[in-house]
């Protein structure tokens, strides 16, 4: 018989299957990768029990809970829990704090399905605290270096060739710029933090103690970099990636036009996907309207519209280079040049993609 679990580190390192007893509304606010939500109560049932608890106390709330989850409902949920337990005999169950909900499910599984299934002591809150501490400890104990560079130099491409990268944009499902929103949604803030911490945990378990990050702002789309990490990023040494203007334009064309359009088409089909892609590009330009200024915004938006019309009509993408070149020369490059000057004393190396990659690999030896 397996015992209830307190070894949170091994749970995440081994990707142990877990079922979450919390209500859907709790699960949506934050969960762990791969965990299955099989709630004891629906959102409405949980709300009723919570109100009863406040007004009449714990005993009355427990009685109401048993009344709400009974008969056919109870049998259906018990079947789902038992199916998970049989499919994942090495797994665990948990609720918010390792309290009544997980105890009740554990008891019902044992008494009515004949399955002894362990739970996680302390529940979701204990697991979440462990992951927050994991990130904090890494910031305190590990070595970090940032990769910076003008827009389109291929920072993400370089990072993906390293085994000690913490991919903030990947975890946030966002490219980091005003145009960085993907076709699929970003994770909830807590999910972003949890994935980041698990990534750090697994890499440290492999002996990695030096991490490479892209030089990001505090906000990556709608996800916020943990404060302790972001504060460190204001001081970490910086490696500056360089590339030609022409290569940068082509890379942006690839990422923000060709690949983004393909993402939308894959999700929504040809016609709707192309329309949503066009709307996304125009909205991204609109998001920096004030920073561009009226005249520049109108000019670049018109070039973008013409490019989108041509792409829709013939599939041609050449006209997109016009607004990309304009944005780089008139907006992104001056902004990044200013930021680089402000961080000049932290730049320990500069070079092209091959040179930067080799430098970072050597630095990690």
UniProtKB/Swiss-Prot annotation:
Q: Which residues form the active site?
A: 95 (s-selanylcysteine intermediate)
Q: Which InterPro entries match?
A: Rhodanese-like_dom (IPR001763), Rhodanese-like_dom_sf (IPR036873), SelU (IPR017582)
Superkingdom classification of source = Bacteria
Record's PROSITE patterns? RHODANESE_3 (PS50206)
Q: Which SUPFAM superfamilies match?
A: Rhodanese/Cell cycle control phosphatase
Any coiled-coil regions, as ranges:
none
Q: Which reaction does it catalyse?
A: 5-methylaminomethyl-2-thiouridine(34) in tRNA + selenophosphate + (2E)-geranyl diphosphate + H2O + H(+) = 5-methylaminomethyl-2-selenouridine(34) in tRNA + (2E)-thiogeraniol + phosphate + diphosphate; 5-methylaminomethyl-2-thiouridine(34) in tRNA + (2E)-geranyl diphosphate = 5-methylaminomethyl-S-(2E)-geranyl-thiouridine(34) in tRNA + diphosphate; 5-methylaminomethyl-S-(2E)-geranyl-thiouridine(34) in tRNA + selenophosphate + H(+) = 5-methylaminomethyl-2-(Se-phospho)selenouridine(34) in tRNA + (2E)-thiogeraniol; 5-methylaminomethyl-2-(Se-phospho)selenouridine(34) in tRNA + H2O = 5-methylaminomethyl-2-selenouridine(34) in tRNA + phosphate
A Gene Ontology molecular function term for this protein is: tRNA 2-selenouridine synthase activity
**Per the UniProt record, which EC number(s) apply here?**
2.9.1.3
Gene Ontology BP terms: tRNA wobble uridine modification
Residues making up the signal peptide according to the UniProt record: none
Q: Which NCBIfam families match?
A: PRK11784.1-2, PRK11784.1-3, tRNA_sel_U_synt
What is the protein's quaternary organization? Answer: Monomer.
Q: Could you tell me what this protein is called?
A: tRNA 2-selenouridine synthase
User: What organism does the UniProt record list as the source?
Assistant: Pseudomonas putida (strain W619)
